[in-house]
Amino acid sequence: MLLQRLSDRHDHASFRETHQWSIENPGDFWREAWNDLGIAGDPGSTAMTGQGFSYTRWFPEGSLNVVNTLLAGKPDDEVLVALTEDGPRRSFTREQLRGEVAACAAALEASGVRAGDRVAAWMPHVPETVIYALGALSMGAVVSTASIDFGPSALIDRFGQIEPTVLLVPARSTYAGKVADHASVLDEILLQLPSVTTLVVAGGGEARVSFEDWLAPHRGAPLAPVDLPFDHPGFILFSSGTTGKPKCIVHRAAGVLLKVLSEQGYHLDVRPSDRMLYATTCGWMMWNWLVMGLGRGATIVLVDGSPGFPDLGRLWSITAGESLSFLGVSAALIDTWRKAELDPKDFGTLESLRTIASTGSPLGPEGYDWVAESISPDIVVASIAGGTDLCGCLVLGVATEAVRRGEIGGPALGLDVTVVDSEGHQVSAGVEGELVCRTPFPSTPLEFWGDTNGARMRSAYFDRFEGIWAHGDFAKSTREGGFVILGRLDATLNAKGVRIGTAEIYRIVQSIPGIQDSLAVAQPHDGDSRIVLFVVTTDELDEALETRIRQELRSQASPRHVPSLIVRAPAVPRTRSGKMTELAVADIVAARAERDTSSLANPESLEWFRQWAKGSRDL
């Protein structure tokens, strides 16, 4: 076990000792991680320079290309498997994947792409997306992916900011048995993305360049990843769009690789020859996280479509059929299985399964119990928490310790993670506060795209506490060294484990005739959470208007943006400066202690929400 070997090498008796060493000696730790994890490339003579988040540089003399690590190994090993709802199983050996990536890199170069250029993909969770991303990374381009369930408006909000020159899209996609043809929206997307000079369509499409035809002239090209500095950008991920258009978070490819492999290798005991699946889309950071699993020598399994189609046992059938050793899902899905009294063993033998990872929202003790009782008490349940901001985890499982139900194992190695009060002072175990990190790490964002003076990035993470990364999670630590995540501190909606930005909802809803104002919150409900949308309307909220709201959100954003309840309200609370105060309403509907409302211009508006909340549990 990699973590045990690290501890033994330094004569540490516990994970706590190893973690303390890693934060006191970050340069030594990350250099050892580079070597332990088999990162291909030259780290240089210095692992880090400077101090603090603003001035630390990682491997300033380093030179590498992450693709050399991701595609290293025996040529005949199966490394990628893809399963969809309605298509055949597809698989690639390492040599086949290397060939596809080489052809893609050559096609990108022939399309005029150079190192540092942005390329984007609006795609399902299929091999073409992985091949495209690796091809871009191999030549130093910056890749950004978005889920196919984003509508044109949400897509333009993201890609419009970064101005990609090449865009990969699908001809069609399938979810829950329904086939969507995307040809009708491609002209609209291209009209609003004038930077795109090459549109490539996976799965064909008349009058468009297919992915296969795009690669065809370049088949047989050698794979020749370009060595790049450690700080070279590789990914742009997007925030949830809480306070306007989503923030474009620029990540070093090398930083993400090193951070994620440290999580998979040390914390979660992902081993070469493991078979791992994470139920995700291309719009979630867990897609990037899963792809990095290639660097552990693992076989990654892509599953596109609904995890509940044709039945709730789909992922368990795949776990058995593909002999998975690692299965990653959302906490909400585990709760769905538990409430449905699903028996995973009905779908095949699960003897190869060692680890179930859970993220997206807190996993309660009942979820841990369900895994132990329905599968095996020997299964490692690894709840993990972090986010898009670091493309990795702040807290996660600890491979050398027993699982403790209802809590996350410990802080990530190399990260000084703790819980603080509103003044930034560390609080004792069991006391609720804000989750923070007090030391820089390699996957700290390089920048926000377009944030020329760094003001937006400082505001996002460092304005609350000087020199400390404020993550925005409400949490508490435990006496055993673990953590319990209690939810988000900001206004981001978290419905069924998926983060939804309210600003995206408002832009769409408030463009509908008859809607004067709107406010969306997540409300705890039936052991999970649901989105409640309050609207201020010119006339009554009738069935036709409610249907229109749902249709517009589904088509322009995604099905996940559609609220469980739409309720007419007389007014939305706002501050004197005109800012909406979602958190005040969120506290009321969640039955939490209300915060100071002295800054409100219309505090009387909250009384209506208090009365509504009293009777809302039965809705």
Language model segments and positions:
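Conserved ATP/PPi-binding loop(s) of AMP-dependent carboxylate-activating enzymes
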Residues: 411-414, 425-462, 500
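Gly/Ser/Thr-rich phosphate-binding loop
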Residues: 296-298, 325-328, 338-403, 416
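Conserved pre-ATP/AMP-binding loop-to-beta segment of ANL
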Residues: 76-78, 201, 206, 212-238, ...
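Conserved C-terminal "lid"/linker of ANL adenylate-forming enzymes
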Residues: 198, 519-524, 532-533, 550-619
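ANL superfamily adenylate-forming
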Residues: 86, 166-230, 340-341
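Conserved AMP-binding/adenylation subdomain of ANL enzymes
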Residues: 257-275, 285-325, 340-341
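AMP-binding/adenylate-forming catalytic core of the ANL superfamily
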Residues: 121, 146, 150-172, 186, ...
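Conserved AMP-binding/adenylate-forming core of the ANL superfamily
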Residues: 17-21, 80-134, 151-156, 210-213, ...
